[in-house]
């Protein structure tokens, strides 16, 4: 049997990642009517726009599920979010504003935990609502098969028969009404939203046009800080780390990582911290655009990186950032649990994060406008007396030391001049006149 099934497996158990929305509700009922045995699995990821998780499995049973389970994924999601912070696993940014890979992190947790729950129920066929144009279809494919190598994939949105009968939201709404459930479509927004405890993604529809921006978005994790009528008073906040683990906010210890993120989201959200507008490359190398929220992740990232720069040396910081860019791409591609990703992640957790102990105090204002007010750590290698402009006792180096350093470190100046002369004679570089190197004489090579 092929791994990806193009037709409904009649008479067999089919697990569906069930959100309770129109798409998965119609798909579940349709599969039931066509003779499959649907099993519904709902991930509790702490979605900020979900009011009642317990109601979702009840809906699934009402629509014909053989069994419906709510899987609490919040603790695992929090741990993965902290791991991403520790490793700097973020590769998408614009103008210094970062996207924190919150959807890829959510898919890593959902894809593994839901399939593990299905295995417990002897369900080995899985479907979800991802489309063939997006990233999620590949992420779920990888995480699902990683968790259960015997897994088969059935997606209604890849089944032509389903598409012919229920190809649009209007058709799905009419179908559910005909089935006696009176399902009414919610008011259409100008964009679609997907969220979890770590962040929210707004994309598609009007946001596909770059002429539409953040001003059409209604934030679900924070405030519309760009609106002048929205009052956003400045606020001081401190974040404390112990060996790379965030342990306290404003001096209050929070042992539960879920509660920690909820508190960080509340604080950062009051300012709209962590909102960004990104153009990114999907896995299939086509560009897409999204507007993102991640107030808690942003707050952790700022505090963590401040400690990293105060504690570690330049080469360690450079390697942390290079590895983080690579790890961010692997995470985005659905490879968070692949060996190459584990190697990069655990390297950062062991050799970078374990030294990150201390407290950073910030003032948050509107959006991503903030100031760092204080940095405290027993592991700081920042030592102002080394470079003080004032006279200090037992100075670590003298003027003579610097003379020696300048001489030895810059023996290559004559070599550089020579190379510039070679480039000038080859017509690659202009010396003199109005050129950038106008004052540099071509004396770097021996004249014949």
Curated annotation (Swiss-Prot):
Reaction catalysed by this enzyme: L-citrulline + L-aspartate + ATP = 2-(N(omega)-L-arginino)succinate + AMP + diphosphate + H(+)
GO terms under cellular component: cytoplasm
Any one Gene Ontology BP term: L-arginine biosynthetic process
Compartments, record wording: Cytoplasm
Residues that hold ATP according to the record: 17-25, 43, 129, 131, 136, 194
Gene Ontology molecular function: any one: argininosuccinate synthase activity
Enzyme kind, highest EC tier: ligase
UniProt keyword terms in alphabetical order: Amino-acid biosynthesis, Arginine biosynthesis, ATP-binding, Cytoplasm, Ligase, Nucleotide-binding
EC code(s) of this entry: 6.3.4.5
SUPFAM superfamilies: Adenine nucleotide alpha hydrolases-like (SSF52402), Argininosuccinate synthetase, C-terminal domain (SSF69864)
Binding positions (L-citrulline): 99, 135, 139, 192, 201, 203, 280
PROSITE patterns, sorted: ARGININOSUCCIN_SYN_1, ARGININOSUCCIN_SYN_2
Binding-site residues for L-aspartate, renumbered to this chain: 131, 135-136
Any single Pfam family the record assigns to this protein: Arginosuc_syn_C
InterPro entries documented for this protein: Arg_succ_synth_type2_subfam, Arginosuc_syn_C, Arginosuc_syn_N, Arginosuc_synth, Arginosuc_synth_CS, Arginosuc_synth_type_1_subfam, AS_cat/multimer_dom_body, AS_multimer_C_tail
Pathway: Amino-acid biosynthesis; L-arginine biosynthesis; L-arginine from L-ornithine and carbamoyl phosphate: step 2/3
Family recorded in the similarity comment: Belongs to the argininosuccinate synthase family. Type 2 subfamily.
Record text on subunit structure and interactions: Homotetramer.
Name by which UniProt lists this protein: Argininosuccinate synthase
Lineage: Bacteria, Pseudomonadati, Pseudomonadota, Betaproteobacteria, Burkholderiales
């Amino acid at each position: 049997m092929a791994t990806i099934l193009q037709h409904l497996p009649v008479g067999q158990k089919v697990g569906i990642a069930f959100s309770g929305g129109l798409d998965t509700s119609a798909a579940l009922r349709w599969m039931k009517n066509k003779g499959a045995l649907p099993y519904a699995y709902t991930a509790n990821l702490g979605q900020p726009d979900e009011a009642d998780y317990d109601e979702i499995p009840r809906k699934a049973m009402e629509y014909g599920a053989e069994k419906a389970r709510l899987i609490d994924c919040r603790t695992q999601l929090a741990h993965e979010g902290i791991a991403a912070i520790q490793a700097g696993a973020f590769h998408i940014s614009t103008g210094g504003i970062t996207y924190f890979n919150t959807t890829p992190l959510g898919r890593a947790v959902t894809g593994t935990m839901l399939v593990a729950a299905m295995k417990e129920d002897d369900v080995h066929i899985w479907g979800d609502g991802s489309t063939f144009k997006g990233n999620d279809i590949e992420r779920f494919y990888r995480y699902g098969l990683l968790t259960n190598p015997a897994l088969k994939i059935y997606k209604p949105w890849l089944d032509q028969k389903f598409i012919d009968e229920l190809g649009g939201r209007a058709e799905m709404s009419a179908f559910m009404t005909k089935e006696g459930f009176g399902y009414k479509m919610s008011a259409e927004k100008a964009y679609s939203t997907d969220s979890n405890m770590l962040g929210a993604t707004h994309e598609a529809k009007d946001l596909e046009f770059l002429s539409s921006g953040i001003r059409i978005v209604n934030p679900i994790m924070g405030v519309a800080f760009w609106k002048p009528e929205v009052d956003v008073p400045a606020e001081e906040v401190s974040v404390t780390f112990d060996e790379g683990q965030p342990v306290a906010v404003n001096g209050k210890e929070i042992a539960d990582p879920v509660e920690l993120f909820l508190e960080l989201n509340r604080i950062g959200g009051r300012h709209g911290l962590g909102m960004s507008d990104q153009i990114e490359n999907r896995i299939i190398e086509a560009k897409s655009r999204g507007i993102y929220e991640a107030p808690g992740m942003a707050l952790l990232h700022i505090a963590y990186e401040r400690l990293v720069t105060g504690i570690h040396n330049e080469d360690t910081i450079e390697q942390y950032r290079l590895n983080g860019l690579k790890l961010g791409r692997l995470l985005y591609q659905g490879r968070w649990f692949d060996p190459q990703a584990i190697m990069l992640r655990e390297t950062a957790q062991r050799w970078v994060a374990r030294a990150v102990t201390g407290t950073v105090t910030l003032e948050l204002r509107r959006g991503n406008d903030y100031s760092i007010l204080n940095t405290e750590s027993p592991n700081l290698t920042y030592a102002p007396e080394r470079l003080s402009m004032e006279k200090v006792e037992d100075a670590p180096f003298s003027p003579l030391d610097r003379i020696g350093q300048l001489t030895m470190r810059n023996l290559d100046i004559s070599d550089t001049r020579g190379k510039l002369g070679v480039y000038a004679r080859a017509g690659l570089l202009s010396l003199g006149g109005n050129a950038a190197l106008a004052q540099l004489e071509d004396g770097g090579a021996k004249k014949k």
